[in-house]
UniProtKB/Swiss-Prot annotation:
Solcar repeats lie at residues 3-82, 106-186, 209-293. This is Mitochondrial glycine transporter. It catalyses: glycine(in) = glycine(out). Disulfide bonds: none annotated. Keywords: Membrane, Mitochondrion, Mitochondrion inner membrane, Repeat, Transmembrane, Transmembrane helix, Transport. Mitochondrial glycine transporter that imports glycine into the mitochondrial matrix. Plays an important role in providing glycine for the first enzymatic step in heme biosynthesis, the condensation of glycine with succinyl-CoA to produce 5-aminolevulinate (ALA) in the mitochondrial matrix. GO terms for molecular function: glycine transmembrane transporter activity.
């Protein structure tokens, strides 16, 4: 079990790191669109000094995503293994994944609980990331951001927006896992017309087929789950950037709707869908491929 856990830690860390660095511009633009009172994405882009400004906040993003993904994927697999109780693919079945197979309800609950918990654990990094990306605060470094937050808000400042974060992350991950696992079963016959008539002597589909199926399933699932949970993300961002104006979840929702209308809760949705869909496609594809490679090589994973 220890060796298998290392596989998931390494695969999760790598997938999170790659997706964070590649997709940081989407995250920064999403944060600034959500913090503004009606500014369009074009206006936000024009306000940037140089193209490199799009990668402002990459360090905390990479730290949060790499560590968070390592924790999430490892804990998720542990929980799913325990829930599955030894269930395996039936003889003749092939898969794009080496992960345990669960029912829809089990996927929904396990994904939600694990993601919600991990989200709370990495909250301090998330708060630093959001403030560093925004145009409201002008921190000189990550250390300066952390010091300033602690000086003005104490330890409590690192957990602003925790309720909105949990309300966003748990449903998002639960819905994501539900749709992701279903799509992985449905997509092979849709994307590849001859895949169901090919030989079933192999346990998994080819690496290329698996990557295509997993990426499309991940991106589609992320788009659906993101749309459903975007209001919570908007509220979370406001609470972390202006805690005095948005002191708690319910007050924040009321304030936003009263002053900007209900549509403001979906501000930044297009950017978030783009980022989440791409992030899911990249991270889950890399993660599942690395886990399968370790399994095929019968290796315990890199030494940590």
């Amino acid at each position: 079990m220890a060796g298998k856990s290392k596989n998931h830690i390494y695969a999760g860390f790598t997938s999170g790191l790659v997706s964070a660095v590649v997709l940081q511009p989407f995250d920064l633009l999403k944060t600034r669109v959500q913090q503004s009172n009606g500014k369009s994405m074009v206006q936000v882009i024009k306000s940037l000094n140089t193209p490199l400004d799009l990668w402002r906040g990459t360090l905390p993003s990479a730290l949060r995503m790499s560590v968070g993904s390592a924790m999430y994927f490892t804990c998720l697999n542990t929980v799913r293994e325990a829930v599955a109780g030894g269930r395996r693919l039936t003889v003749g079945d092939r898969s794009t994944s080496s992960l345990p197979k669960l029912t829809n309800t089990e996927n929904l609950i396990s994904g939600g609980l694990v993601r919600g918990t991990v989200g709370l654990l990495v909250m301090p990094i998330t708060v630093i990331k959001v403030r560093y990306e925004s145009s409201t605060y002008h921190y000189k470094s990550i250390v300066d951001a952390a010091t300033s937050i602690y000086k003005h808000n104490g330890m409590r400042g690192f957990f602003y927006g925790w309720a909105a974060t949990f309300a966003r992350d748990a449903p998002y991950a639960g819905l994501y896992m539900l749709f992701y696992e279903q799509l992985k079963v449905a997509l092979p016959s849709i994307l590849f017309s001859d895949i169901t008539t090919s030989s079933h002597s192999e346990k998994y589909y080819s690496s290329w087929s698996s990557a295509m199926i997993n990426s499309v399933a991940a991106a589609t699932s992320a788009g659906i789950a993101t749309t459903c949970t975007n209001p919570f993300d908007t509220v979370k961002t406001r609470m972390q950037l202006a805690p005095k104006e948005y002191p708690n979840f319910l007050t924040s929702v009321k304030t936003i709707i009263q002053h900007e209308g209900i549509q403001a809760l979906f501000r930044g949705l297009a950017l978030r869908i783009c980022r989440k869909a791409c992030q899911a496609g990249i991270s889950w594809c890399i993660y599942e491929d690395l886990v399968k490679r370790f399994e095929r090589m019968n290796l315990p994973g890199p030494q940590l």
